[in-house]
Amino acid sequence: MGMWASLDALWEMPAEKRIFGAVLLFSWTVYLWETFLAQRQRRIYKTTTHVPPELGQIMDSETFEKSRLYQLDKSTFSFWSGLYSETEGTLILLFGGIPYLWRLSGRFCGYAGFGPEYEITQSLVFLLLATLFSALTGLPWSLYNTFVIEEKHGFNQQTLGFFMKDAIKKFVVTQCILLPVSSLLLYIIKIGGDYFFIYAWLFTLVVSLVLVTIYADYIAPLFDKFTPLPEGKLKEEIEVMAKSIDFPLTKVYVVEGSKRSSHSNAYFYGFFKNKRIVLFDTLLEEYSVLNKDIQEDSGMEPRNEEEGNSEEIKAKVKNKKQGCKNEEVLAVLGHELGHWKLGHTVKNIIISQMNSFLCFFLFAVLIGRKELFAAFGFYDSQPTLIGLLIIFQFIFSPYNEVLSFCLTVLSRRFEFQADAFAKKLGKAKDLYSALIKLNKDNLGFPVSDWLFSMWHYSHPPLLERLQALKTMKQH
């Protein structure tokens, strides 16, 4: 009877209290689930101290130990940063941080002569203050991750001055995009009538397509240097491969990622007949500034006292990453172009837009429910921006978790298909060696807990991909 009495008492609570309690309960349930998974994976890092027999041919014990220690440090950092984030979010909700920030935004607007009727203006001030708070509270964690963990394991290439300049630039660019887009979205919702959700969805669709189109040409160059890949054998072979699968390649760029990190990557962008490929310099063995630094440090005299410590130079050289040979770079690109040829990019866009439309439709259904606003401290007003925040971030959180897991499963399937496409191009052997090198260069740990990898990994574990490629190589 006691349990049923408690349940009856729960249902007799005001709707806003039930909603608030359910949001907090679900948030902590997800956090505890994530922590449980992380601890399972951490146990793997701690107990797997020797190279498993099946990895003996592809990874030496020194690299294995370095990757194990790197992932252990990342795991520890993730635990404490996750605990802080969950605690911070809970305290903000419990102590009315969202309505307080809304009232503070109203006061700032009042000082400038804007009354309560200027809701969109107040919403923009709210967004500015919220993103500023998020940036400031996240800064110590980002600093520690970059200058302690990444530095310790040889990945960080930034100075403190570069890091701070980069952070400020990112914040300013974000505001230049976020504030105008948000103001237009709020205006569309205000004037859209009964079918505002259709207009809001179409607007966000156009914005996302525009951002994808201009990102690499106008936004990314604000942070990194892009240079055309020099004429030569690699560029010729990339163009030949692109032509063989009818990929409408117009340009190939190399981005100077080495000034920020020694992690490597490659991607393509653009719509219709204007596709471009971007290679990180850290991916290219013959191009990487990091490899040139190795030669300089090992073949030149120390430039100053700080660099004069031979042990420091040895450690620096040891931590540099080798990148991939041209054949391996082509195999990696064959995999990436496989995503395009197999329609993965289009499928992901369609899924994203179907999800966006569904969310705006459900938002239209729920926005009139005053108890949703009351649950988060808004008893006398129902600002549109706050409605978006409450519904998209809190009310939709169970749906978002399920969708995220489904997309992770789909992503792994796409990765296997892209590997198979690279094999059809005759790149199985080179992709096999490239995956091993990239895993080594990025200190990826090749052993994973099955439940952790199932929930988190958007790419299949290394061993699974290698086994699939080995099977392909035999045919």
From Swiss-Prot:
Q: Which residues lie on this side of the membrane: Nuclear?
A: 40-81, 145-170, 217-347, 406-475
Class of this enzyme: hydrolase
Q: How does it sit in the membrane?
A: Multi-pass membrane protein
Keyword terms: Antiviral protein, Disease variant, Endoplasmic reticulum, Endosome, Hydrolase, Membrane, Metal-binding, Metalloprotease, Nucleus, Protease, Transmembrane, Transmembrane helix, Zinc
Cofactor(s) needed for function: Zn(2+)
Q: What CDD domains does the entry give?
A: M48A_Zmpste24p_like (cd07343)
Q: What GO annotations for molecular function exist for this entry?
A: double-stranded DNA binding; endopeptidase activity; metal ion binding; metalloendopeptidase activity; metalloexopeptidase activity
Question: Which reaction(s) does its UniProt entry say it catalyses?
Answer: Hydrolyzes the peptide bond -P2-(S-farnesyl or geranylgeranyl)C-P1'-P2'-P3'-COOH where P1' and P2' are amino acids with aliphatic side chains and P3' is any C-terminal residue
Provide the E.C. number(s) assigned to this enzyme: 3.4.24.84
Q: Where in the cell is it found?
A: Endoplasmic reticulum membrane; Nucleus inner membrane; Early endosome membrane; Late endosome membrane
Record topological domains on the Lumenal side: 1-18, 103-123, 192-195, 369-382
Q: How is the cofactor bound?
A: Binds 1 zinc ion per subunit.
| Expressed in which tissues | Widely expressed. High levels in kidney, prostate, testis and ovary.
Q: Which positions bind Zn(2+)? A: H335, H339, E415
A GO CC annotation given for this chain: late endosome membrane
Q: Which GO terms describe its biological process?
A: adult walking behavior; bone mineralization; CAAX-box protein processing; calcium ion import into sarcoplasmic reticulum; CAMKK-AMPK signaling cascade; cardiac conduction; cardiac muscle cell development; cardiac ventricle development
Concerning what turns on (or off) its expression, the entry says: By type I interferon.
Q: What is the effect of changing H335A?
A: Loss of catalytic activity but not viral restriction
Primary location group: endoplasmic reticulum
Q: Which family does it belong to?
A: Belongs to the peptidase M48A family.
Query: What is the UniProt domain comment for this protein?
Result: The metalloprotease domain is constituted by the two C-terminal nuclear regions.
What disorder is listed for this protein?
A: Mandibuloacral dysplasia with type B lipodystrophy: A form of mandibuloacral dysplasia, a rare progeroid disorder with clinical and genetic heterogeneity, characterized by growth retardation, craniofacial dysmorphic features due to distal bone resorption, musculoskeletal and skin abnormalities associated with lipodystrophy. MADB is a disease characterized by mandibular and clavicular hypoplasia, acroosteolysis, delayed closure of the cranial suture, joint contractures, and generalized lipodystrophy with loss of subcutaneous fat from the extremities, face, neck and trunk. Restrictive dermopathy 1: An autosomal recessive form of restrictive dermopathy, a genodermatosis mainly characterized by intrauterine growth retardation, tight and rigid skin with erosions, prominent superficial vasculature and epidermal hyperkeratosis, facial dysmorphism, sparse/absent eyelashes and eyebrows, mineralization defects of the skull, thin dysplastic clavicles, pulmonary hypoplasia, multiple joint contractures and an early neonatal lethal course. Liveborn children usually die within the first week of life.
Q: What is the protein name for this chain?
A: CAAX prenyl protease 1 homolog
Task: State the species of origin.
Answer: Homo sapiens
Give the taxonomic lineage as stored in the record: Eukaryota, Metazoa, Chordata, Craniata, Vertebrata
Give the gene symbol.
ZMPSTE24
